[in-house]
């Protein structure tokens, strides 16, 4: 890392993580982790069914909060710090936010697909001892990932993503 300081300012640059990529990447990666935890929670052991429901609700609320907070914070930073040449561009901010809503579920899906095919560790599912339950959690994850990957172009808010997750879980449970 590099630290640059003057009398009134300090900047820290970590060159290892200096990356300019899609705005929705980090958010998508984190949401993907929460989705995998949600799928695991559907099938791993809990002290009670009430505990399972509470944890699943917590995960969905966390996804909602993350997305909404990201969008609000991005908008506030844009309004406060955007360069002058972008300030007057009608619809640019909305276009960027919509792009995040399209990209983020795609990245969430990709991280879980890689985990499902054992390209990277899947600790959320590794704690599920029952092989059938573990398989069901993996299949549910793949179904949700598929659903959000191909449904993402219609998402306008976190609610749309969460509706997809809940809807796919409900349909999957009917097949068990």
Show which residues each predicted segment covers.
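Surface-exposed helix-capping loop/turn segments at secondary-structure junctions
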Residues: 72-88, 153-158
């Amino acid at each position: 890392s590099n630290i640059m300081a003057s009398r009134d300012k300090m900047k820290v640059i970590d060159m290892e993580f200096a990356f300019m990529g899609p705005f929705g990447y980090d958010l998508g990666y984190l949401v993907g982790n929460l989705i995998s935890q949600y799928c695991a929670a559907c099938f791993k052991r809990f002290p009670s069914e009430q505990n399972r429901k509470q944890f699943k609700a917590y995960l969905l609320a966390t996804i909602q909060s993350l997305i909404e907070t990201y969008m609000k914070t991005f908008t506030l930073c844009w309004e406060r710090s955007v360069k002058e040449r972008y300030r007057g561009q009608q619809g640019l901010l909305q276009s960027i936010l919509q792009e995040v809503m399209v990209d983020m579920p795609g990245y969430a899906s990709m991280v879980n697909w890689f985990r499902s095919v054992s390209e990277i560790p899947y600790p959320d599912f590794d704690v599920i001892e029952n092989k059938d339950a573990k398989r069901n959690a993996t299949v549910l994850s793949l179904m949700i990932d598929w659903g959000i990957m191909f449904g993402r172009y219609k998402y306008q808010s976190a609610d749309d993503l969460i509706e997809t997750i809940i809807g796919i879980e409900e349909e999957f449970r009917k097949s068990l």
